[in-house]
A protein has these predicted regions:
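Recognition helix of helix-turn-helix/homeodomain-like DNA-binding domains
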Residues: 31-47
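A short, Lys/Arg-rich alpha-helix, primarily the initiator
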Residues: 1-25
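Short, charged recognition helix plus adjacent turn
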Residues: 39, 68-87
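Residue-level signal for the short linker/turn that defines the boundary of a DNA-recognition helix
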Residues: 20-21, 48-51
Length: 87
């Protein structure tokens, strides 16, 4: 599973857990633009930045550590692309 899919699934899960919060409402709560949030959810943004993750976590009234603390993320292996290493 790709990193962006993990983040997207986590956002969907937290929205559902908190009473089916819409992405529009999450955008208002977090300060992340609706378009940026939709790009993450749809997988167009492959690597959301830490500032964006932080804003989303705050929107859910949690820390970054809490936002990222779920089984799939804890087992995820980050592997650098070959072209990134060579660059």
């Amino acid at each position: 599973m790709e990193y962006v899919t993990l983040i997207s699934n986590r956002i969907r899960e937290l929205c559902k857990q908190r009473g089916n919060i819409s992405f529009y409402k999450l955008s208002e709560m977090s300060g992340v633009s609706t378009s940026a949030l939709e790009n993450i959810i749809k997988g167009h943004t492959k690597n959301p930045g830490i500032a964006t993750i932080h804003q989303l976590a705050l929107g859910f009234n949690m820390t970054i550590a809490e936002f990222c603390d779920f089984d799939e993320m804890n087992m995820y292996e980050f592997v650098e692309e070959e072209n990134e290493v060579a660059g």
